[in-house]
């Protein structure tokens, strides 16, 4: 791993975490997709994780943030059980969109940007990124637990 600057380390860790995310998503059996944990179906847990990553990694207060085409009001809220349903293709498409968005963002990021606040935002870029890594990996762990409880197998990780 190259450790030449903070943004290089953040970029590499993000690339690895995106790989882990793809791996976990690929390991979720179709039979588990609609099973509810804590009241929410597995796909909604995934959507929640992805939506928060999409909105919070860069700037949660961005007035130009656009909800994904599959979004319905409160779909990301795990306390509100949806009438809508997302299939694997819709989740995968959203994941690929986020992956591309983060790649562009990280390409433009420099160390001196990390302690700056994005426009209209309370927190620094560094705080937002670390907070998302915490939240993101909490949900990856939950998803891995769902898979392991169902299959007895643990998804492979880096």
Where in the sequence are the language-model features?
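A general marker of short, structured functional hotspots
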Residues: 2, 43, 77, 90-91, ...
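Alpha-helix C-capping/helix-to-loop hinge sites
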Residues: 28-31, 81
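Acidic/histidine-rich alpha-helical segments that form the ligand environment
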Residues: 78-116, 127-136
């Amino acid at each position: 791993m190259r450790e030449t600057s903070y943004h290089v380390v953040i970029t590499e860790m993000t690339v690895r975490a995106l790989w882990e995310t793809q791996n976990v998503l690929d390991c979720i059996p179709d039979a588990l997709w609609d099973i509810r944990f804590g009241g929410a179906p597995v796909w909604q847990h995934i959507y929640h994780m992805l939506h928060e990553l999409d909105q919070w990694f860069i700037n949660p207060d961005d007035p130009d943030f656009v909800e994904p085409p599959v979004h319905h009001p409160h779909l990301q809220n795990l306390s509100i059980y949806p009438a809508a349903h997302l299939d694997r293709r819709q989740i995968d498409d959203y994941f690929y969109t986020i992956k591309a968005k983060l790649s562009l963002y990280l390409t433009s990021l420099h160390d001196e940007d990390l302690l700056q606040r994005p426009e209209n935002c309370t927190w620094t870029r560094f705080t937002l990124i670390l907070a998302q890594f915490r939240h993101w990996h909490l949900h990856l762990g939950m998803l891995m637990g769902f898979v392991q409880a169902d299959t007895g197998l643990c998804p492979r990780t880096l």
